[in-house]
Amino acid sequence: MLSPERILQAGLGFRESQMLLSALELGLFTELGKGPRTAQQLCRALGLSAQAASPWLDGLVSRGFLERDGAGDGAIYLNTREAAHFLDRKSAAYVGAELEGLGERVYAGWEALIRSLQDGAPSL
């Protein structure tokens, strides 16, 4: 049944997807497979902006992909048990290969959907 919650979930679903896909592309889960890291350590290792990375990391925590121990600059991030099992490239159970590059291959076409619907040019 369609509800306000379902409508909001559908409208905001891309955020969770993009957060996960970017984490896979950047190798976040594999980096955390080496051990817990602060946001600053992750930024150095992955070449990220500290200003942009902290909300992204906290978003991954709120969605259950990561855990955080502590708060502020001293907070430590680590993979959840499931993320370590399924999203670390070094794991035999890695499923991220199915998703790698998806943002580039698929989302680019979806971004042009409204233009395509208006002018008839293919986007997908």
Spans of model-derived segments:
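Conserved Class I S-adenosyl-L-methionine-dependent methyltransferase catalytic core
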Residues: 4-26, 30-37, 41-45, 51-124
